[in-house]
Amino acid sequence: MSRHLVEQINKYVGENDILFHLGDWSFSGIENIWNFRKQLKVKEIHLLIGNHDHFIKRNRVLPNVYRTEPYSQNLADGKPIGGEYPDYVEAKTLFTSVHDYLDVEIDNILVPLIHYPMENWNDRFGKAYHLHGHTHGMLPVKEFRLDVGMDNAFILFGEYRPFSWEEIKTMLDDKK
């Protein structure tokens, strides 16, 4: 399944796009955290911590599984990570940023991002679009709240893949 998810992300997200990953990056091992990231073409990934991201949440640093080979590039921006063989690197070497919660603005719309769904969010009664994961498509689209997990994409579109901003706007504007 991981290979399929990588293929789908690379198919729908361009190298110069921005990917907001709303949690549960990896359900297993440190090596999988690194390997999943290395296979993605997109350069800019903002990670919102999910309930299965225990190691990243607890430590915000990751063992460098490539410390026995000359691996010294930051996967997010290509800059050196400090020494040829560091034992540990900050999670931000894999991601552009790592957050528990993040407000972003896209097309003049406030977009609160968090792994978990909320009943109330910043500017809920304005036109903020609350995007979340965690619920595996079990919650219906409500007002301006949407589960953008890849499993919900399967329910809505018939394939595991990221949502585009255009799809999100269309779905949530219909809920006005």
Model regions and ranges:
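Conserved beta-sheet core of the metallophosphoesterase superfamily
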Residues: N64-K176
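Core catalytic region of metal-dependent phosphoesterases/phosphodiesterases
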Residues: M1-Y101
